[in-house]
């Protein structure tokens, strides 16, 4: 046929049977990838330490999505929260993966069947005897079915009425678990961090979809609107479908990058803004302050900080620190976290408590500067010793650890103090195992970063595709020189259906 690669889809332009076939095959590929990727991730996933080596540190991409929908058990006998189980049931991680692969195989067979048996009576227009699709009616059917699915998810799955519920956690990602969620019908339902909004919005959107679907099934579009929007042209469907997809991609890129109830930090890792705003650091200091107010010692107060909370307050878990094109999981970068060393508190020889300035997100190197409680610089690690005034040696800085593995240990040796000051730039200090995975010490992004980058990139591409195909269908007569009202809409030199010599062509006098 001599078609260039970017025009091969014209073979299904006027062939409803094979148009259906290629869409079923596309579903087979998507479901097959999801199931296969899940099995691969389960083969390499280590569930032994959900606190310091959670799924997002290991670079898991599909396991978090299964988990947020209520899957927590494995046929391997482990639970995502670190426990062991004896009866995981059919809907385990492996069960979901297997279901996708079986579904993919059935779709593959269905696609082949529809490719072979493309000329079905259902696609035949009784008036003309030619294959055609009633696109407004199909739109109504799809809208109705999507509405039923959306309503069912919100009313049954999320609420736990007939389903497991969804992953719900506290604002600091410490107590996450799968639980049923009641719909939030008030103003709080519009808060992106309120899980109840997920249930209520799916119920509301599903109801709207069902009503809109019934409307489009029972009411025909006016002729002027039908012709003006080219509702009889399959490329109109392509253009509007691409619009829906790129809009959804932009939305989920935002909810992933900025965080929401749909993207819990326990499953996808913290957001960069939680580092930028000192979100976890403030909560840690609040808890320590509350402990001191209860007459606990500094050591006791810091020892009660959950290791999980301290680990979030580490720059290596910031998704914006990893380069977009650095392959591998976070564990392949700075290593596998083994334990929290404790919180270092620095003091000068006059007894003032000093605070190390933390590294901003987009810096690779940053000067080591220690300030007092008023923000006045009291010590640093100078670049040029000859001009230094505030060096650790000159100021007599010492460090003492509270909580963690080094609880109660203090150092006054300048080299050791400077070592921990440099590490304190990166947040709480952890022992990291770089040997096991041959980690290179260069930060990597989390699945939160990959998901956002991928969806923004494809959303921009699909936005262009929407404009392209929308313009093609709206101005088809201008581009091709063909009147859109002709009975046989044929581009010059082409058959209505490729290889079909019965296509009517306007007689040129």
Curated annotation (Swiss-Prot):
Cofactor: how and how many bound: Binds multiple chlorophylls. PSII binds additional chlorophylls, carotenoids and specific lipids.
One cellular component (GO) term of this entry: chloroplast thylakoid membrane
Membrane-topology descriptor: Multi-pass membrane protein
Cross-referenced Pfam families: PSII (PF00421)
UniProt cross-references to Gene3D superfamilies, sorted A to Z: Photosystem II CP47 reaction center protein (3.10.680.10)
Function in brief: One of the components of the core complex of photosystem II (PSII). It binds chlorophyll and helps catalyze the primary light-induced photochemical processes of PSII. PSII is a light-driven water:plastoquinone oxidoreductase, using light energy to abstract electrons from H(2)O, generating O(2) and a proton gradient subsequently used for ATP formation.
Name of the protein in question: Photosystem II CP47 reaction center protein
Species for this entry: Cicer arietinum
The organism's taxonomic lineage, starting at the top: Eukaryota, Viridiplantae, Streptophyta, Embryophyta, Tracheophyta
């Amino acid at each position: 046929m001599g078609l260039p690669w970017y025009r091969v889809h014209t073979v299904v332009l006027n062939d409803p049977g094979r148009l259906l076939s290629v869409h079923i095959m596309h579903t087979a590929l998507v479901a097959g990838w999801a199931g296969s990727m899940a099995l691969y991730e389960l083969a390499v996933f280590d569930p032994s330490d959900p606190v310091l080596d959670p799924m997002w540190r290991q670079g898991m991409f599909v396991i978090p999505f299964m988990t947020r929908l209520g899957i927590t058990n494995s046929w391997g006998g482990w639970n995502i929260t670190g426990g062991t189980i004896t009866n995981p049931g059919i809907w385990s991680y492996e069960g979901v993966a297997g279901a996708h692969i079986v579904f993919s195989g059935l779709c593959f067979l269905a696609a082949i069947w529809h490719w072979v048996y493309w000329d079905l009576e259902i696609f035949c227009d009784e008036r003309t005897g030619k294959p055609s699709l009633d696109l407004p009616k199909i739109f109504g059917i799809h809208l109705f079915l999507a509405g039923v699915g959306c309503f069912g998810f919100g009313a049954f799955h999320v609420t736990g009425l007939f389903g497991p519920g969804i992953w719900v956690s506290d604002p600091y990602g410490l107590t996450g678990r799968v639980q049923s969620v009641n719909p939030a019908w008030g103003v709080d339902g519009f808060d992106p961090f309120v899980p109840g909004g997920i249930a209520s919005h799916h119920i509301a959107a599903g109801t709207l979809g069902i009503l809109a679907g019934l409307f489009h099934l029972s009411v025909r579009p006016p002729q002027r609107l039908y012709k003006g929007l080219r509702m009889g042209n399959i490329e109109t469907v392509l253009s509007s479908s691409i619009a829906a997809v790129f809009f959804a991609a932009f939305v989920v890129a935002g909810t992933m990058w900025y965080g929401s109830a749909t993207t819990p930090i326990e499953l996808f890792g913290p957001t960069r803004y939680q580092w930028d705003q000192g979100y976890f650091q403030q909560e840690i200091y609040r808890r320590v302050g509350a402990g001191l107010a209860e007459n606990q010692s500094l050591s006791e107060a810091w020892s009660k900080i959950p290791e999980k909370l301290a680990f979030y307050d580490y720059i290596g878990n910031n998704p914006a620190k990893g380069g977009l094109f650095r392959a591998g999981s976070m564990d392949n970068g700075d290593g596998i976290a083994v334990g929290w060393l404790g919180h270092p508190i620095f003091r000068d020889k006059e007894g003032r408590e000093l605070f190390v300035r933390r590294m901003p997100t987009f810096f690779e190197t940053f000067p080591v500067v220690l300030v007092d409680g008023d923000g006045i610089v009291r010590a640093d690690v100078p670049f040029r010793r000859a001009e230094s005034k505030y060096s650790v040696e000159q100021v007599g800085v010492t460090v003492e650890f509270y909580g963690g593995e080094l609880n109660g240990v203090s150092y006054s040796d300048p080299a050791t103090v400077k070592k921990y000051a440099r590490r304190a730039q990166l947040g709480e200090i952890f022992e990291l195992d770089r040997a096991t995975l041959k980690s290179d010490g260069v930060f990597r992004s989390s699945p939160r970063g990959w998901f956002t980058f991928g969806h923004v990139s494809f959303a921009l591409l699909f936005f262009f595709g929407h404009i392209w195909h929308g313009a093609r269908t709206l101005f088809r007569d201008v581009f091709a020189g063909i009147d859109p009202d002709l009975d046989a809409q044929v581009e010059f030199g082409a058959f209505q259906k490729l290889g079909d010599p019965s296509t009517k062509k306007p007689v040129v006098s």
